């Protein structure tokens, strides 16, 4: 396994991470098989695991907590995402911060995710949908900074809408976030135009979502 520095956090994470969406009560999913798969990835050197409350209403977060506790001697990095209050993906232009991430909702779901996983803190907490215009109402990001300072998580990230890499550039350039998750593979390379240069400039980590196009590129 090769490792990379995760932006300005300076974490040394495996360049191949584990996305846990498929472990959220999908048809045919099995908890024992999921845990075996997670453990094999740890044994092979994977150290970065990405989940979300929206993956089975916390089901996937619970599995992540189990694999963390099963490997107490290893530093495994935990990333999860808060759902929008209206539970609608992706975000739309007309959605306001209060529709999706009012401060009380953020605090509630950060604590729900911690309880689901049985962890005291996450390494990375992400907005599961994002609109750059939400920066105009800083209550959401300020609540995240407050919870980060309380030690509930250690870095802040955003997960961008499909085909909208430009819709996170303001957040990246604000200096308020530590990572951005965006679709990037041989079919969709738009993030290279503006988003990736902004991330390099601000030392913001990039998480490539569906790098194999949800299995299309694996044969």
State each model region's role.
Residues 86-100:
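Surface-exposed, active-site-proximal loop segments in enzymatic domains
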């Amino acid at each position: 396994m090769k490792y990379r520095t995760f932006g300005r956090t300076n974490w040394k994470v495996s360049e191949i991470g584990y996305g846990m969406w498929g472990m959220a009560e999908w048809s045919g999913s099995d908890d024992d098989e999921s845990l075996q798969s997670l453990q094999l990835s740890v044994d092979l050197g994977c150290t970065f695991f990405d989940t979300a409350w929206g993956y089975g209403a916390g089901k996937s977060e619970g599995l992540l907590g189990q694999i963390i506790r099963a490997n107490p001697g290893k530093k495994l990095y935990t990333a999860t995402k808060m759902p929008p209050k209206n539970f609608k993906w992706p975000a739309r232009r007309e959605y306001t911060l209060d529709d999706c991430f009012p401060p009380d909702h953020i605090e509630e779901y950060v604590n729900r995710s911690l309880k689901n996983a049985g962890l005291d803190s996450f390494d990375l907490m992400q907005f599961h949908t994002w609109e750059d215009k939400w920066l105009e109402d800083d209550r959401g990001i300020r609540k995240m900074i407050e919870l980060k300072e309380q030690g509930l998580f250690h870095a802040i990230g955003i997960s961008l809408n499909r085909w909208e890499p430009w819709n996170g550039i303001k957040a990246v350039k604000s200096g308020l976030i530590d990572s951005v998750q965006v679709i990037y593979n041989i079919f969709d390379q738009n993030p290279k135009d503006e988003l990736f240069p902004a991330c390099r400039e601000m030392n913001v980590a990039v998480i490539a979502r569906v790098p194999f196009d949800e299995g299309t590129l694996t044969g």
